[in-house]
Amino acid sequence: MTPLVLVTNPVGAYLPPAQASLEGEWKRELLRLHGVTFDALYCITNMPISRYLEWLIDSGNLVGYMERLVAAFNPGTVDGVMCRGTLSVGWDGRLYDCDFNQMLDLEVAEAAPRHIRDFDLPRLTSRSIVVGRHCFGCTAGAGSSCGGSIK
C-alpha cells in the first residue's frame, strides 16, 4: 500500500511546532474524530515569498516574522537543506538551487552551468548557492524541507 503523508504549515506569522509531537497529536485526533490513519506528517515553514510575503507586508507582520526566522536560525539544519543536494529545473531547462529560488527567478550562480543541457556535476557540486532572506525559512528551528523538518 502507498504511504499517506500529510503536509502542514502554520496559519499566520509563526514557525511550525515540533513535527514529531504534532504528528502524534494529528494521528490521535484524526483517528478519533474521523477514523483516518496516515503514515507521516511533514511540517513546513512558510517562506517569506510570493503571496505569503504579500500577506506579511499587508498585515504588518513582515519585520516580526523575519526577526523570528533569523533568531531561530539553526546551523545544524544547513547540511540538510534542499539546495545542498537538489536542483530545480525550470520548464525551459534553466537550473535553480531550490524551488523557492525558481519561484523568485534566481538562477544558479554564474560559475555553474545555468541550463540542463550544460549539466556538469563537478561544477554544480562546487558552486556557490544563491541565497536570500527567504533562506532563513529553511534553517529556522528544526529546519524545513520537502520532507518536513530537518533536525
What does each of the following model-derived ranges do?
Residues 48-56, 85, 99-104:
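Hydrophobic scaffolds flanking metal-cofactor catalytic centers in soluble metalloenzymes
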